[in-house]
A protein has these predicted regions:
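Acidic/polar loop-and-plug regions of large Gram-negative outer-membrane beta-barrel proteins
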Residues: 269, 273, 286-292, 296-380, ...
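Extracytoplasmic beta-strand/coil segments of soluble accessory domains associated
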Residues: 86-125, 129, 135, 141-180, ...
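Outer-membrane beta-barrel translocator/receptor signature
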Residues: 194-197, 208-287, 293-299, 373, ...
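Short acidic/polar hinge/loop motifs at secondary-structure boundaries
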Residues: 152, 163, 179-203, 222
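Non-catalytic regulatory/gating segments with a bias toward low-complexity or hydrophobic composition
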Residues: 124, 132, 143-144, 199-204, ...
Length: 660
């Protein structure tokens, strides 16, 4: 598969940017990703009250050995991710210069060394809040528009999922402020980006930081954090031609209490689709306090609540192209199809009836959505000039629900013409209740080894994840008319209960050794212990056969690579990295009859990163070779056979120029 993408845009107000991205990829095996059917409406933006985009996070000094360096490192730590102080619209915001591809931002998605994206021996993209505003990005799914070689989609049963480098779904890990919560197809939800500082994307295996999964890459959503300085307030609003609207408010800065800084954000997005009776309503509110106890110690606490209420589009029935009364569309779908929901049959040419393009076949009482609550707290302690300790504890509580007619399919055996009750419908209801607790602690040591600067990070992480599912087993079905469906209501429901518990503990080490001022070795290794237990009860409360069961996994993953600045603004890099994930499904739905094994994935990657002397032009190039072994495929329902391996090879090129 070869794809060529061209993207150009302009930066409003502060400067103009001409952004070109080029992607050419060859994938030996890739998975298709369902795309959102909602039309991408062009919003009419009302200018913000105050525009004060956050500056990129600052990288601490490589080897602070003097009091001056120590002070600089503390300052960078306190102001990490700080928004610029309010300035006139004609004046550039204060803080470090953001490069065209934003590679000067510190990221946590690929490494815990505290280095900028440019210094990583991997392809790391950072989409800043400013970039999101310039490109009109409103939701986390839209972030794919700003990333090279990344596809995003809102499939109704698994919203906010991504595909990159030939992998998709649960092989792409999703993190929230560096915290994994579980397989993305089970935990992913659409989210407004107004409260985010940046979105970090690493491409290729990344289990070193992201843990189980991350075969194709990982995406980290990073919230805005407080800054030290005058209070800055900002607000925005927009509306579109479908009467959808979006509004938000943010505020942050120093309080009257010495050393106490705050950040608060709230937003709401009502996004209406072009299919009858479809919409997505997203609400986010978040806040954080930072308190500088002294020059060496900072403590903080954060809370975030997210809610989405949705009426998703579940598809339009395919109909026989030659059936009596059908008004076919052209250039939309073509080919042969048979209704496998009803046992198949002889494949026939199909089309979509032109009169059903906006028809909703879902039940009237359909709903989908989620309520999510995050509580996080931590500290950062500079123990000495060269040793620092940071830690965060977190709690996450989520309730998700689906209550829909998920299948609408033409049945030739009932009526082979428009007007008959020929559309077969089938229901599914599902509820999730998830509770996650955990801790991540990093010890960073900067030192000098034989005259060479060295940075070492040891990370200890532990979490307890309870994931409960209540799922309808009746799959109630009925028939409706193709052109005038009587949508009706959901009908009877009888639920089975599934309880999954996952305890995870990991120990990882990372190191960067600068052999010279221009050449550095970067590597890391992660040891992980994962204990899974599952129990399942049928709709009558009886324990199902082969349950409960448990399994322990002990994957070891890592990365080794180098970076070499061969000339000013020209850096070469290469890496070898590995990842692990379940062989047949995500870990929340493994059954005792499925192979309880892990796949192993590896990547070879090499590339070059270019940055002009004036930091107005930037380009990256990478070539990769990914292989995922021990892959199984479904057969006869819940039986699985070894399929061998998946492989993906390709190249990526990104370039951007900012005009004066």
């Amino acid at each position: 598969m070869q794809n060529l993408h061209f993207r150009a845009g302009a930066r409003p107000a502060l400067s103009r940017a001409f952004l070109i991205t080029l992607l050419s990829s060859v994938s030996l095996s890739s998975a298709a990703l369902a795309q959102s059917a909602a039309q991408d409406n062009r919003s009419r933006e009302v200018g913000p009250v105050i525009v004060s985009p956050p500056a990129p996070r600052q990288a601490p000094a490589v080897s602070p050995g003097t009091q001056k360096q120590r002070a600089a490192r503390r300052s960078a730590g306190r102001n990490r991710g700080a928004p610029a102080v309010a300035v006139p619209a004609t004046q550039a915001p204060s803080g470090p210069v953001q490069t065209p591809l934003n590679t000067a931002a510190v990221t946590d998605v690929g490494s815990r060394l505290g280095i900028i994206a440019r210094e990583m021996p991997a392809t790391v993209e950072v989409i800043s809040q400013r970039t999101m505003q310039e490109l009109g990005i409103r939701t986390t799914t839209d972030v794919a528009k700003a990333a090279v070689g990344v596809t995003g989609g809102d499939a109704p049963g698994a919203p906010a999922i991504f595909s990159m480098r030939g992998f998709s779904g649960d092989q792409i890990s999703t993190l929230y402020n560096g915290i994994p919560i579980g397989p993305s197809t089970m935990t992913g939800r659409p989210m407004d980006v107004a409260g985010l500082q940046q979105v970090e994307i690493i491409k290729g295996p990344d289990s070193l930081v992201a843990g189980l999964g991350a075969t194709g890459g990982a995406i980290d959503y990073v919230n805005k954090v407080p800054h030290t300085g005058p209070i800055v307030n900002d607000a925005f609003t927009s509306w579109d031609s479908f009467n959808g609207y979006r509004a938000g408010y943010g505020s942050g800065g120093s309080t009257l209490i010495n050393g106490l800084d705050y950040r608060f954000d709230i937003s709401h997005f009502n996004n209406k689709g072009f299919i009858d009776d479809t919409y997505s309503k997203l609400s986010n509110v978040s806040g954080r306090l930072n308190y500088r106890v002294n020059e060496n110690l900072k403590i903080w606490g954060a809370v975030e609540y997210r809610q989405d209420n949705d009426r998703f589009y579940w598809g339009t029935p395919l109909v026989p192209a030659n059936a009596p009364g059908i008004v076919p569309t052209y250039g939309v779908v073509s080919g042969l199809w048979s209704n496998y929901y009803l046992g198949g049959g002889t494949p026939v040419p199909v089309t979509i009836d032109a009169r059903t393009l906006t028809t909703n076949y879902n039940v009237l009482d359909n709903h989908s959505g989620a309520n999510e609550l995050w509580l996080r707290s931590g500290f950062q302690w500079d123990i000495t000039n060269n040793i620092s300790l940071k830690s965060q504890v977190y709690g996450y509580d989520a309730h998700r629900h689906w209550f829909n007619n998920e299948i609408s399919s033409f049945d030739q055996t009932v009526g082979n013409f428009a007007g008959a009750l020929s559309i077969y419908r089938e229901r599914l209801a599902l509820d999730h209740a998830q509770r996650l607790y955990g801790n991540i602690t990093d010890l960073t040591v900067n030192s000098n080894v034989g005259g060479m600067d060295n940075r070492f990070v040891a990370t200890v992480a532990a979490s307890s994840n309870q994931f409960n599912v209540s799922q309808d087993t009746l799959f109630f079905n009925d028939y409706v008319d193709l052109l005038n469906p009587d949508r009706g209501f959901y009908g009877p429901r009888a639920d089975e209960k599934i309880y999954t518990h996952l305890d995870t503990a990991s120990l990882s080490f990372e190191d960067r050794l600068k052999l010279t001022s221009t050449f550095a070795l970067i590597g890391g290794i992660r040891f992980e212990n994962i204990e899974l237990s599952r129990t399942r009860f049928d709709e009558n409360g009886l324990l199902k056969a082969s349950y409960p069961f448990s399994k322990t996994f002990n994957p070891v993953t890592g990365r080794i690579g180098y970076t070499w600045d061969i000339a000013p603004g020209v850096m070469l890099y290469s890496q070898y990295a590995t990842a692990a994930d379940p062989t047949v499904a995500n870990i929340f739905i493994l059954r005792p009859t499925t192979p309880l094994l892990l796949t192993t994935s590896r990547t070879y990657e090499t590339g070059v990163k270019l940055l002009s002397a004036d930091k107005r032009a930037e380009a990256t190039f990478s070539a990769f070779d990914i292989e995922r072994k021990n892959v199984y495929v479904p057969e006869s329902g819940i039986l699985f056979n070894v399929a061998g391996k998946m492989a993906s090879k390709g190249v990526e090129i990104a370039a951007a120029v900012v005009a004066p």
